[in-house]
Amino acid sequence: MLRLPTVLRQMRPVSRALAPHLTRAYAKDVKFGADARALMLQGVDLLADAVAVTMGPKGRTVIIEQSWGSPKVTKDGVTVAKSIDLKDKYKNIGAKLVQDVANNTNEEAGDGTTTATVLARSIAKEGFEKISKGANPVEIRRGVMLAVDAVIAELKKQSKPVTTPEEIAQVATISANGDKDIGNIISDAMKKVGRKGVITVKDGKTLNDELEIIEGMKFDRGYISPYFINTSKGQKCEFQDAYVLLSEKKISSVQSIVPALEIANAHRKPLVIIAEDVDGEALSTLVLNRLKVGLQVVAVKAPGFGDNRKNQLKDMAIATGGAVFGEEGLNLNLEDVQAHDLGKVGEVIVTKDDAMLLKGKGDKAHIEKRIQEITEQLDITTSEYEKEKLNERLAKLSDGVAVLKVGGTSDVEVNEKKDRVTDALNATRAAVEEGIVLGGGCALLRCIPALDSLKPANEDQKIGIEIIKRALKIPAMTIAKNAGVEGSLIVEKILQSSSEVGYDAMLGDFVNMVEKGIIDPTKVVRTALLDAAGVASLLTTAEAVVTEIPKEEKDPGMGAMGGMGGGMGGGMF
């Protein structure tokens, strides 16, 4: 029997032989205090500098290399922020934290990402400087948040509700970098579908921007067979006052659809069949009857896949007042169909590529309840794909959908413009929600006097308040700097002027901001400050930073190649 010491002695040579191969992957590197903060600040500076150049009406664009396709040209702050990834791990941590500020602001308000980024840089930079001189970072953070609360309260006092289409157009124009055409098209869209209506942005097919209003439920599935066409003009099938049969399952047998056809025939109504598929003898019988006796029917494949298809069919059932056959939990068979199981619509248009159900006769209360359910799902989902699909479903159930088709001469131009249109649309929605304040960074400047009355608990909190006082000047200074003038002089002149006067960077003049329509949504300014202060003041409290040391790849060397050559040589003869 072997004793334990003997076993261990025998294992030693083995462990020595294996030692070079048993290396730890992903070891960590730790930096403390001023060293760590200095490196993070360099990352913050790099990201903020790249984003800041896009600010204001005379801001420049940024060109971003992409892993595929042509480079992206943009003036959208959050797009620039997201594209930055630094090689140095410590610098990258600083950059990523400010990137989070831009992302949060974009998700909550849809605009104001550049403002949030320059504010975050200012707060972090000043905070680091004060801490290096011995101030307490925790108390500085308390002072910063105290000042931010006071500024937000003051912003709410300054805020005015958006009432007219002209004001909506002004907000959209400012956010679209002074493009009045974009401002007007968004204002028109809101006029047509209502302020809470659904507005989507898509690539256009022409050189000009277009606005299309879609009423009812439109989905991208056309007729299954061209024999269903009933108009000579436009290769489409059109019905007035029709019944709708909805099925989750494939329809192949004729017997299953005869009862529905008999009901439609008895009521002298056309029938629209929307199912997973219609094929076999069911399809051939429908086509034959359509051609021989002029049967008023059209078959369409249900849109989407999996759960998305089920949800869309359920939406159609609610919008038209019908039921979905084959739905889990409901023992509804197509053979037992009754008139009340069929949906009812005022008008149906089916083309080769899409179908539209207009003037659905569904119960308004049920539709409202369904809209509420989808809105609640939207609030909790984090997936961008899910959000897109939920928004599409919401749009179809709402009164109408406005589609902004962005035109241009090339993909690069369309994509750049699309970024601005999306920003403008988000800013407009934010303005309708919480009102408007002076634009051009003036609203934040007008909040500075409100900080004078604050009573900090100690000297370090007072430093935090002073940090915010200086940060509030940064957006206006950045806009002026991008317009080629001295920012600090512009800011001082604005502070000495009456409350509605600000700097119009486009004209290079001091004007009444409200009369000129240079306004920002309150929600955008508030969110930008809150997110920037929260993350930047947390950044200043960091005393240690832990990063992963990249795994070193061993150089295989050239020895293997030589051996391989010899082996091959030996094998050849």
Swiss-Prot record:
Residues 1-26 form a transit peptide. Its EC number is 5.6.1.7. The modification Phosphoserine is found at residues 67, 70, 410, 488. There is a cross-link at residue 551 (Glycyl lysine isopeptide (Lys-Gly) (interchain with G-Cter in SUMO2)). It is an enzyme of class 5 (isomerase). The modification N6-acetyllysine is found at residues 75, 82, 87, 91, 125, 130, 133, 156, 191, 202, 205, 218, 236, 249-250, 269, 292, 314, 352, 359, 389, 396, 455, 469, 481. GO terms for cellular component: cell surface; clathrin-coated pit; coated vesicle; cytoplasm; cytosol; early endosome; extracellular exosome; extracellular space. ATP binds at residues 75, 111-115, 440, 520. Keywords: Acetylation, ATP-binding, Chaperone, Isomerase, Isopeptide bond, Mitochondrion, Nucleotide-binding, Phosphoprotein, Transit peptide, Ubl conjugation. It is found in: Mitochondrion matrix. It holds the Pfam family Cpn60_TCP1. The keyword Secreted does not apply. InterPro entries: Chaperonin_Cpn60_CS, Cpn60/GroEL, Cpn60/GroEL/TCP-1, GroEL-like_apical_dom_sf, GROEL-like_equatorial_sf, TCP-1-like_intermed_sf. GO terms for molecular function: apolipoprotein A-I binding; apolipoprotein binding; ATP binding; ATP-dependent protein folding chaperone; cysteine-type endopeptidase activator activity; double-stranded RNA binding; enzyme binding; high-density lipoprotein particle binding. Transmembrane segments: none annotated. It catalyses: ATP + H2O + a folded polypeptide = ADP + phosphate + an unfolded polypeptide. The modification Phosphotyrosine is found at residue 90. The keyword Transit peptide applies. The modification N6-succinyllysine is found at residues 31, 82, 125, 133, 191, 202, 205, 218, 236, 250, 301, 352, 396, 455, 481. The modification N6-malonyllysine is found at residue 133. GO terms for biological process: 'de novo' protein folding; apoptotic mitochondrial changes; B cell activation; B cell proliferation; cellular response to heat; cellular response to interleukin-7; isotype switching to IgG isotypes; mitochondrial unfolded protein response. Belongs to the chaperonin (HSP60) family. Chaperonin implicated in mitochondrial protein import and macromolecular assembly. Together with Hsp10, facilitates the correct folding of imported proteins. May also prevent misfolding and promote the refolding and proper assembly of unfolded polypeptides generated under stress conditions in the mitochondrial matrix. The functional units of these chaperonins consist of heptameric rings of the large subunit Hsp60, which function as a back-to-back double ring. Homoheptamer arranged in a ring structure. The functional units of these chaperonins consist of heptameric rings of the large subunit Hsp60, which function as a back-to-back double ring. Interacts with 2 heptameric Hsp10 rings to form the symmetrical football complex. Interacts with HRAS. Interacts with ATAD3A. Interacts with ETFBKMT and EEF1AKMT3. Interacts with MFHAS1. This is 60 kDa heat shock protein, mitochondrial. It comes from Rattus norvegicus. The lineage of its organism: Eukaryota, Metazoa, Chordata, Craniata, Vertebrata.
